[in-house]
Amino acid sequence: MQLTNYTEYALRVLLFLGALDEEEKTNIKDIAAAFSISEHHLSKIVYELGKLGYIETIRGRNGGIRLAKRPAEIVIGAVVRETEENLSLVECFAAHGNECVLTPVCRLRFALHEALEAFLRVLDAYTLADLLEDRASLRSLLKERRG
């Protein structure tokens, strides 16, 4: 299973924001610089994370981006489900466009579905807080990357 860059970058944004002090804000430019990601692409991700309620964007002179929830309330499996456009591992998972002739009798489909569910179940066991246990090291590394 390979996550899309979109989902990976969404998780990176959350890690970046989680590494900040509680009331500290940042901006898309700083996050993009830290991860060498296009600001344009990142703005779409930030917009969606805001719509999903994970982050808040504050406009104005003292504006910026910060987490909208405590890290312990952000479940990694949920973020993956909400940002990953297509969790279909194989053609037969798709509701439309399945042309595999084996589908009516295929047992592989069930095994792969079970594997996907196990993958997501493991991610459901982690919150952003779990991933931020060594927050000081993460913060230091990100500060270096921003310059």
Curated annotation (Swiss-Prot):
Limits of the HTH rrf2-type domain: 2-133
Pfam families membership: Rrf2
Cofactor note: Binds 1 [2Fe-2S] cluster per subunit.
InterPro entries: TR_Rrf2-type_CS, Tscrpt_reg_Rrf2, WH-like_DNA-bd_sf, WH_DNA-bd_sf
Matches recorded under SUPFAM superfamilies: Winged helix' DNA-binding domain
Lyase keyword on record: no
One GO molecular-function entry: metal ion binding
Residue ranges of DNA binding: 28-51
Cofactors: [2Fe-2S] cluster
One GO cellular component term noted in the UniProt record for this chain: cytosol
Source superkingdom: Bacteria
Keywords associated with the record: 2Fe-2S, DNA-binding, Iron, Iron-sulfur, Metal-binding, Transcription, Transcription regulation
Residue positions binding [2Fe-2S] cluster: 92, 100, 106
Family annotation (NCBIfam families): rrf2_super
Main function: Nitric oxide-responsive transcriptional regulator.
Name this polypeptide is given: HTH-type transcriptional regulator NsrR
Organism: Geobacillus kaustophilus (strain HTA426)
